A protein has these predicted regions:
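Beta-strand-rich modules
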Residues: 1-5, 71-92, 159-180
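Proline-enriched interdomain boundary motifs that mark the N-terminal boundary
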Residues: 19-27, 106-115
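Short strand-edge motifs at loop-to-beta-strand transitions and within beta-strands
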Residues: 67-69, 155-157
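Conserved aromatic anchor
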Residues: 33-45, 121-133
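Solvent-exposed loop/turn segments flanking beta-strands in beta-repeat/beta-sandwich domains
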Residues: 42-56, 130-144
């Protein structure tokens, strides 16, 4: 009291109420570049008014009235340390919930693998791929099902030095700039059979035919006339390689480099003689290449003609444009067909690029008698008396000539080589050289009466006529230079052999 006296002590016990804080539970989910935090909060004595989110272990918080929050713009494949708490209406906070969450990482992926540009010894592999979280840095390629790998920064790779006609199991995967890899994806491809051009690389065209087109008599309709084998008694015996039969793949595109060979530039291989390939024009020559000195045209008889020309210019063997001006001299050196049409006009009109590929040849133009080359002559007999033992030893050096009678005879199938030349019309379906229009050969008839040369009739037989009286279609014939090489082609009419220009 006022004078300093104290009362006695009164003791009692009092208990205050406990304050209930809010409580939380937290779940998280992630994508490549974001993390979403979801909070399930239970209020205590106050209402929940705000949520607080941190992605950097509590260094910085973002407040929100919402119970979920998404952190965007994150780095893929990265671990983030999350903290979350809530505040109630009385300013009281929950305990801090801690979570660890990593953003997802999208690996690079390969969606497509294809094989292209397949040859006999190479295959190109093409890859379609996406980078995922990072860009692609390298492509890995295997040709042996993943045993060994090569790598490149390019999405295509060409395997070379492969074996022909072999199936390869190719595998591919990619890596990104962070070193992450895709899964492997594969494709199988079989290398081609070697093309003739590949097999003949570095060889002359003549050697290519002898060593790669010819394998044995009859294969590819090609026969070696070496006096050996089934037809040895009927062969020429000159070691030539000759195409025989109905329609061998012996086409050559000569005089043009366009993708589809014009029909006027199609030639066919008679054979290989020594180191030279001998060609004959597939169809009859036009005025544009042979020029003047023709005497009218002929409309081919559709019953016989095998070509596509609407009309064919006709030339006398002696060469003038009118038989009134012709001589009946059947000497090839004096023929204007030879000197003007073939060895001047034709050579000039095909151009120097192509004429320079034609060899100057010693043509055997001595000829022989009616009996030796026609009436009593088989194909071999005709060859003997036309080439080996002509009536005269006359030769003529020039680039362009016409077919020999024996060329025509040996173009028929070998089972017909014992036919008489006068009966070759019976086997025209087995003779690729037959075209169905009268045409001159280079071979003169010797003896009397004079002034005659042999020709192939429209029905496929052999006959003779006066050089100043009959006019026929002309198919230039020549030997290629020995150094000419093959560039491409299979020898078919649609894919003829192409020569290196």
């Amino acid at each position: 009291d006022s004078i300093g006296r104290e009362s006695n002590v009164y003791t009692t016990t009092v208990r205050t109420d406990t304050y209930k804080l809010p409580t939380i539970s937290v779940t998280t989910s992630a994508t490549e570049n974001s993390i979403t935090v979801r909070v399930n909060a239970t209020p205590g004595d106050g209402n929940i008014v705000s949520y607080h989110y941190s992605r950097d272990d509590g260094s910085n918080y973002t407040s929100s009235p919402n119970n979920s929050y998404t952190f965007d713009g994150l780095t893929s494949g990265t671990t983030y340390y999350l903290k979350v708490y809530v505040t109630d209406s009385n300013g009281r906070t929950s305990t801090v919930a801690t979570r660890t969450q990593a953003t997802t990482y999208v690996n690079p992926s390969v969606s497509r693998v294809t094989a292209s540009n397949i040859t006999s010894d190479s295959v190109t592999i093409n890859v379609t791929a996406s980078g995922g979280s990072n860009s692609i840095s390298r492509y890995y390629y295997s040709s042996n099902n993943g045993s060994t790998w090569v790598n490149s920064t390019s999405s295509s790779y060409t395997f070379t030095n492969l074996s022909p006609e072999t199936t390869y199991n190719f595998k591919v995967y990619v890596t990104d700039t962070a070193g992450h890899s895709s899964t492997q994806k594969g494709v199988s491809a079989t290398t081609n059979e070697p093309t003739l051009a590949e097999l003949c690389s570095g060889k002359t065209f003549a050697n290519c035919i002898k060593e790669n087109v010819y394998t044995s008599d009859g294969v590819n309709d090609l026969y070696l006339h070496d006096g050996v084998g089934t037809y040895r008694s009927l062969e020429a015996g000159d070691n030539s390689y000759r195409f025989s039969g109905a329609n061998p793949n012996n086409y050559v595109c000569f005089g043009s480099t366009v993708a589809t060979c014009p029909s006027d530039n199609l030639y066919r291989i008679i054979g290989v003689f020594g180191n030279q390939v001998k060609l004959i024009k597939y169809d009859y020559a036009s005025i544009s290449v042979l020029g003047s000195h023709y005497d009218g045209i002929t409309i081919p008889n559709a019953e016989y003609y095998k070509g596509d020309l609407s009309y064919i210019p006709c030339y006398y063997w002696s060469g003038s444009s009118s038989n009134d001006n012709n001589t009946d001299v059947n000497t090839w050196s004096e023929s204007q067909l030879n000197t003007v049409n073939l060895n001047t006009n034709y050579l000039n009109n095909i151009g120097s690029t192509w004429s320079s590929k034609i060899a100057t040849t010693r043509w055997k133009v001595g000829g022989n008698t009616y009996d030796n080359l026609y009436r009593d002559a088989t194909v071999q007999t005709s060859y003997q008396y036309e080439i080996k033992s002509p009536a005269e030893s006359t030769t003529y050096n020039a680039k362009i000539g016409l077919m020999y009678l024996s060329d025509y005879g040996y173009a028929t199938s070998p089972e017909n080589w014992n036919e008489y030349m006068m009966h070759l019309n019976y086997v025209i379906n087995n003779n690729w050289m037959y075209m169905g229009v009268d045409e001159w050969t280079i071979t003169r008839r010797s003896g009397t009466p004079s002034g005659f040369a042999f020709y192939i009739t429209q029905d496929g037989s052999v006959d003779f006529f006066g050089v100043k009286y009959r006019k026929t279609g002309i198919r230039p014939t020549f030997y290629l230079n020995s150094d000419v090489e093959l560039e491409s082609g299979t020898g078919s009419a649609s894919d003829p052999y192409r020569l290196v220009v």
